[in-house]
Amino acid sequence: MDSKLNIIIRPCMYDELQSVISINESTLPENYPIYFYEQIMEKYSDCFLVSELKNSPKSIIGYVMWRVERGISSFGIQLIKKGHLVSLAVSENYRRMGVAKKLLIESMKKVCNYDINEFVLEVRSSNFTAINLYQNIFNFKKIRVNEKYYRDGEDALYLALKRENMNFI
């Protein structure tokens, strides 16, 4: 990780959605229509964050989006509130510099304001870098494999983390 990379993590603004969409389309195979981003921003604006270079304002290099949902706990049979990671992406030139980690830390703090009990996410089974980040840095646990989850037929790992196990903040 390049500790000299000076970034700011802050809420995404509506006029920055095109930059977020560009990062999404250039880095991830899952693409969403603009109204999807608008809905997340409208309902969970505090959990829709961007990262920008400190010395170059409005130069967005990554983003993270969460939503809150109710469902059965990944760790027991009870109805709970979950923070669900919708999307996380960092521009190619800024990967492996700690940007995703910083986005996750700051956004997970925000998601906690919704009194969630756990965090959940899906990640491509071939995305070893992301899996390493989620499991080894953030302590997410693999709950199951969602077969053929993605449009191209790839499996997703369904990972979860109990809120009380947030020992990385």
Language-model segments: what does each one mean?
Residues M1-M13, E164-I169:
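Eukaryotic N-terminal low-complexity, Ser/Thr- and Lys/Arg-rich leader segments
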Residues M1-S3, S74-Q78, N136:
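Intrinsically disordered, low-complexity regulatory tails flanking kinase catalytic domains
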Residues Y44-S45, N127, Y150-D155:
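Short acidic/glycine-enriched loop/turn segments that link adjacent beta-strands
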Residues G71, V120-E122, Q135-Y158:
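Conserved catalytic-core motifs of GNAT/GCN5-like acyltransferases
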Residues S87-I105, Y114, E118, R124-N132, ...:
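Conserved glycine-rich acetyl-CoA-binding loop
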